Amino acid sequence: MTERLQKILSARGMASRRKAEELIRAGQVSVNGVTATLGDCADPETDDIRVAGQPLAVREKNVYILLNKPRGYVTTLSDEKGRPDVAGLVADCGERVYPVGRLDMDSEGLLLLTNDGAFANALMHPKHEVEKTYDVWVTGYMPGGERRLAKPITLDGYTIRPPKVKLLKAEGQSAKFRVTIHEGRNRQVRRMCDAAGMHCTRLRRIQEGSLRLGDLPLGKWRYLTEAEVAGLVQTPGTSGTI
């Protein structure tokens, strides 16, 4: 069955969908000896697909990993600035896995990694609206801060859906919230705090869809169970089946 090349490369764990598109544009991908262009399709079972002259990798077993990411790690597999990356934290899993979505360097908590490109792309697609829940520590809190934080704002030209906000603790101008969002805009929760007149000092993701961080130690990872993978495929907080 023919599929778009970037989807094939992603499904084989050779690159993320975006990176695969970059490789195709750079002329690094060929099909049956002919340099591919973006939009080309191929059959991975019958066509000779190569990346930088190397044949397409044999299909790997699907691996799904939950990492409790510490602060100070970038959510990439390598970093041109030499900063610590999450790849080093999961190197002993024995498979090349890719982060599902982003968690910025200054944030911590639940991060999914997998070599199942189709699963990752579906989970990240905006139409599924997978809910993500964070514990958020702020300074600059004033009474009513939770109501300001819960107001919809416009980020990057897009009006986000009103988040769910619960005040967990407040002492003077310091507070802790639990915030659930539906999108995944760049540094979204931190920018929401700024818009509400508060400064986010710590951010920890504790849940994505039906998957919870639980008591997994910081910097450690574990495999998802079959039930957890199935729960993400059909999870509360999505607009249908992934």
What is the meaning of each model-derived region?
Residues 1-242:
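Basic, flexible Lys/Arg- and Gly-enriched helix-loop patches that mediate nucleic-acid binding at interfaces
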